[in-house]
Structure formats: C-alpha cells, structure tokens
Amino acid sequence: KIWKSPIEGSLKYRHAAPVRMKKGTKYPLLVFFHGAGGRGADNKGQLIDAGGLSAFEKMGLRTKLNSHIFAGQVPKGEKWVNVSWSLLGHKTPEISNSMRMTMEAMDSYIQNPKNQVDTNRIYVMGLSMGGYGTWDAIHRRPDFFAAAVPICGGGDKSNAKKLAHLPIWAWHGEKDLVIKPSRSRDMIDAIKKAGG
C-alpha cells in the first residue's frame, strides 16, 4: 500500500491483519521499524531486512499471537531518525518524513473500525536503524504504546523520565560495529535512574 500524507509526501507500507478475526473482538498491533538494509522503493525490504518480519512469520508467531502487523518502508538515503549512528548520544531531532508518515498511516489504520485494533495493546519494535525509530516513536508518544523492543538502537536520554512507566525490552550485541552497544545501555540506565 501507499500512504499519501495530507501534509506532504507518500510512504510505502505493509500491513497484515490477524489470521483469525471475530466480529466485536479487538486485536493487538505490532508496529515494526526496519533497519538500513530494508530501505528502498520495493515495499518488500522492510519484510526481509535482517530476517526481521520474515523470521516472525517463519516461526509462526503471527499465527500464534494473532495480531496486526504494520511496517513502513524508508526510501533509500533516508532514516527513521535523522541522527548519525556514530554519536555517543543525541537530542530528539525534528521528526523525519518517514516517521511522520508512518505515524499518520498507522493512526489511520488504527482508527478504521473494521481493523478492530485494541488501542491498549499497540507494541513497537525495530532493529538497528529501526531501533532508533523505536526509541524515537516512544519518545514522541510515551503513552501510546503498551511496550517497546528496541534492538541495537539509541535514543535521547533526556526523555528517560517520560519512559519510566513503559515496559521496554532492549537488545544490543556487544560486538555491534555500526551502533555502539553503549547507546542501548545508556538509555536503559537513564530509564532505571528515572524510576523505570
């Protein structure tokens, strides 16, 4: 699908409804932010980047969890969050076009009653560049998501207090050569210091 923004631009995205839906029942939604390898214009890269969503499907988790899945695709040369991955920290920048349009398209999807989305069970996860996207999404909407799984990302530590209530399961490989593992550790430490 293609989302045409009422503000400016368009975004390619994929969504999948729960495998089994019953009228009147609400279902969880997983918003997925792909890594740099998923960028492009084919509306497929976000599904196969680093095994992300394709692994989710192969393991049977979509059927088991019976949830909606929503995944936008960042065009080549752009990012979910406009910051350098080599930095040891950053302040939340102006929202990127891809993040803005993903939020617009996601909101439209959620608000459509035929999709039967449970607004108390909206989860977000992403890897690498998408880990940054996950942190950015929860910084911008700390009360919107039920939980977050940022994998190999980094965020703005000054937002830690507003994230202290949110269940976060952060992952980062110690040998990551692209994004320093300290980016994830520093975020979790800041959230713990803020009471999380």
Give the label of every model feature segment.
Residues 21-25, 79-128:
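Gly/Ser-rich "nucleophile elbow"/oxyanion-hole loop immediately N-terminal to the catalytic nucleophile
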Residues 111-164:
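Primarily recognizes the serine-hydrolase "nucleophile elbow" in alpha/beta-hydrolase
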Residues 1-29, 67, 101, 125-127, ...:
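A domain-start/cap signature at the N-terminus of enzymes
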Residues 44-46, 180-190:
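Short alpha-helix in the alpha/beta-hydrolase fold that links the catalytic acid
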Residues 31-33, 151:
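Alpha/beta-hydrolase
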Residues 169-172, 176:
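Short beta-strand/loop motif that positions the catalytic acidic residue
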Residues 29, 36-100:
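Active-site machinery of serine-nucleophile hydrolases
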Residues 33-35, 172:
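The conserved beta1-alpha1 loop
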